[in-house]
Amino acid sequence: VSFKVEEKGEIEFKNVSFKYPGADEYILKDINFKAKSGETTAFIGSTGSGKSTLINLIPRFYDVTSGEILIDGENIKNVSLHDLREKIGFVPQKGMLFSGTIESNLKYGGEHISDEYMHKAAEIAQATEFISSKESGFNTEISQGGTNVSGGQKQRLAIARALAKNSEIFIFDDSFSALDFKTDAKLRKAINEELSDSTLLIVAQ
């Protein structure tokens, strides 16, 4: 089964409940909502309330215990993991970087990411300035785990990597926490302007 080409990343949760394998307690019970393209859906709640668990169900890091999740009307269990995850740009709470250049990090996970998309993604993620300030620019080597860049720079590169995939759905799991106020505001403004046709899901603490 594949996604309908003409559709644009609408997500629907239908009576979704979830508990971890072997657990008695449900973390999520009877969740119903729709997230549409061109809209931002925010998940706000205290630590441990299940926000991250909920969004981790969309790329199928876990499967629902009951109910179903649809993307463009198709149950995500009927679609290959490859096709599902190609449709999603996901930024986890702690964005991981790998040893290699900034370019190889930004193009990781996307099969055919062009230089144009890479540069645009870095611009939206407010990463262009600090990348340009480095002598080798996008060819700058990153240490394993990103130990030679700051927390805010690491987060911006993780955001740029997700954006470079040019997906229809973008999920940000508390992904702006290491950014200063000014950078955060600029990044949110750029995301709203540049990704106005995408489906955005944002977890906030």
Feature map (PLM): residue ranges:
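ABC-type nucleotide-binding domain
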Residues: 4-205
